[in-house]
Amino acid sequence: MELLLGNELGATYPAAEPKREEPPKPFALPPPNADMRRVYAYLMKQRRVSREVVTHFARSGLLYEDAQYHNCIFVGTDEHGVPRHAHKRSTNSQGKSFKVNVEGSRPQHSFHHVGQDGLLYVFEAPIDLLSFLTLYPDRWQEHSYVALCGTGGQAMHWMLEQNTRLRDVVLCLDHDEPGQTAAKRIQEELQEA
């Protein structure tokens, strides 16, 4: 070993300090734009979501356009109607799309609609939810819907805890490997509950 080190035994270095946990950032909605032109254009022309569906969520304060980058902002609220979650989706129709939850968002409070009957539809993304409502517009407001903003089941479980009348769950996750894996996991969680 001395031959490799050139007759030096080397130096010892102190171990790195353990990484400190940073406190979670407080949740804050991105500032809204003065209008929603780009969001309406993107959702209606690019994604073919109906004007009625977009307008419903915009008037409810659950969908708007952010001022800085003109992203779609999908707002999730708690049981008191206080915003606790926001999902950003770029309105860029060319190039790579951008999707992210705003820092400090609570995953259990993602974008949702609470209806009066016992049926809950579960989606991966808010735009999947809006597209479904466009395809099946008849009395859609009677049912409940939640977008997981990913494949975690926290938002669905929160909806079921808050709304005890919800008895039937329809999983509408993507038909890809992550979506199908999540669907199986969530189905098992529901059967165990």
What are the functions of these language-model segments?
Residues 1-2, 56-62:
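Short, small/acidic-rich helices and loops at N termini and domain boundaries
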Residues 1-42, 177:
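Non-catalytic accessory segments of DNA primases and related replication-initiation nucleases
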Residues 34-38, 42-47, 51, 61-62, ...:
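Active-site pocket-lining segments that scaffold enzyme catalytic pockets across diverse folds
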Residues 67-162:
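Phosphate-handling DNA/RNA-contact segment within nucleic-acid enzymes
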Residues 122, 166-178:
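Acidic beta-strand-to-loop metal/phosphate-binding motif
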Residues 150-154, 173-184:
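Acidic, metal-coordinating catalytic cores used for nucleic-acid/nucleotide bond scission
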Residues 158-162, 181-192:
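Short, aromatic/basic amphipathic alpha-helical patches
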